[in-house]
């Protein structure tokens, strides 16, 4: 994803949705979205009225920014979802949730997906006992994700796990907190994904 140089808190305000991009700060009273829940800029409190296309675009931007993907990466995931059997919008969200960078975040090993991508690329995690340094790696049921031995005393991981009860772990994953190990019990289904997204609008956008 191209480097975003502004405060990521502005993205939450722009999309009118808490995207949980700043880790623990998003759960504190310092959260910019909770304090100023309107778009950034001089005229931010006057929310614009969007056209049909604008509404579809904003919905795509929400999901793309939440999972930290570039436009090209997002299009590739959408193309894969469209190729598979089933409802394209739901499949899209399931594929995004099944990524390794999202799973280490959901398990509480990191406090944001961005941090998850950084640690994955630096070989701090194993999948089924093997090094995986690809954040977009798609997990399967039965996969075991664990912090590798040399990384088990990392402060950032310990601090994130200390707050996991507050965030919670989704039902499709199980966490062995003391062992710093997680298991994919099953693939997520749409009902497991509680983010307020209208994925059909994204399908309509890409169908034009």
Swiss-Prot record:
Top-level taxon: Bacteria
Keyword Ribonucleoprotein in record: yes
SUPFAM superfamilies linked to this entry: Alpha-L RNA-binding motif (SSF55174)
InterPro entries named among the record's database cross-references: Ribosomal_uS4 (IPR022801), Ribosomal_uS4_bac-type (IPR005709), Ribosomal_uS4_N (IPR001912), S4_RNA-bd (IPR002942), S4_RNA-bd_sf (IPR036986)
Sequence ranges assigned to domain S4 RNA-binding in this UniProt record: 98-158
Keyword RNA-binding in record: yes
GO cellular component: a single term: small ribosomal subunit
Gene Ontology biological-process entries: ribosomal small subunit biogenesis; translation
Keywords associated with the record: Ribonucleoprotein, Ribosomal protein, RNA-binding, rRNA-binding
PROSITE patterns in the record: S4 (PS50889)
SMART domains linked to this entry: Ribosomal_S4, S4
Alphabetical list of Pfam families matching this protein: Ribosomal_S4, S4
Gene3D superfamilies, per database record: Ribosomal Protein S4 Delta 41, Chain A, domain 1, RNA-binding S4 domain
One MF annotation (Gene Ontology) recorded for this entry: structural constituent of ribosome
Subunit comment: Part of the 30S ribosomal subunit. Contacts protein S5. The interaction surface between S4 and S5 is involved in control of translational fidelity.
HAMAP family referenced in this protein's UniProt entry, alphabetically: Ribosomal_uS4_B
Chain's role: One of the primary rRNA binding proteins, it binds directly to 16S rRNA where it nucleates assembly of the body of the 30S subunit. With S5 and S12 plays an important role in translational accuracy.
Entry similarity comment: Belongs to the universal ribosomal protein uS4 family.
Record-given protein name: Small ribosomal subunit protein uS4
Species in which this protein is naturally found: Desulfosudis oleivorans (strain DSM 6200 / JCM 39069 / Hxd3) (Desulfococcus oleovorans)
Lineage: Bacteria, Pseudomonadati, Thermodesulfobacteriota, Desulfobacteria, Desulfobacterales
Name of the encoding gene: rpsD
